[in-house]
Amino acid sequence: MSKGHSLQDPYLNTLRKEKVPVSIYLVNGIKLQGQIESFDQFVVLLKNTVSQMVYKHAISTVVPARPVRLPSPSDAEHGDSEPGNA
């Protein structure tokens, strides 16, 4: 895994697991709102009334509706940041 994912993946996973409403701003200025349903290396699935697949290269900013706490490295050792532990 590249260094670019060391912050991105835990952040998106926390937003997904805690079902935090997010606003996603695209590079063209469009604002999308919903909850992160899933994500991979290239896309984010955003669920609102419908699911939208948004390519990460089109995303400028992800703004959560409330503050989120990222898991610390010690949490990861205990498996708290694994996707299956929701």
UniProtKB/Swiss-Prot annotation:
Quote one Gene Ontology molecular function term. RNA binding
User: Pfam families this protein is in?
Assistant: Hfq
- Classification via InterPro entries: Hfq, LSM_dom_sf, Sm
Superkingdom per UniProt: Bacteria
Q: Where is the composition biased (Basic and acidic residues)?
A: 75-86
Q: Which UniProt keywords apply?
A: RNA-binding, Stress response
Carries keyword RNA-binding? yes
Which residue ranges does the record assign to the Sm domain? 9-68
Cellular component annotations (GO), alphabetically ordered: cytosol
Biological process (GO) annotations held by this record are: regulation of DNA-templated transcription; regulation of RNA stability; regulation of translation, ncRNA-mediated
**Region (Disordered) residue spans:** 66-86
> What PANTHER family does the database record attribute to this sequence?
RNA-BINDING PROTEIN HFQ
Q: Which family does it belong to?
A: Belongs to the Hfq family.
Its quaternary structure?
Homohexamer.
Which HAMAP family did the record assign?
Hfq
- Function (record text): RNA chaperone that binds small regulatory RNA (sRNAs) and mRNAs to facilitate mRNA translational regulation in response to envelope stress, environmental stress and changes in metabolite concentrations. Also binds with high specificity to tRNAs.
Q: Which NCBIfam families match?
A: Hfq (TIGR02383), PRK00395.1 (NF001602)
Q: What is this protein called?
A: RNA-binding protein Hfq
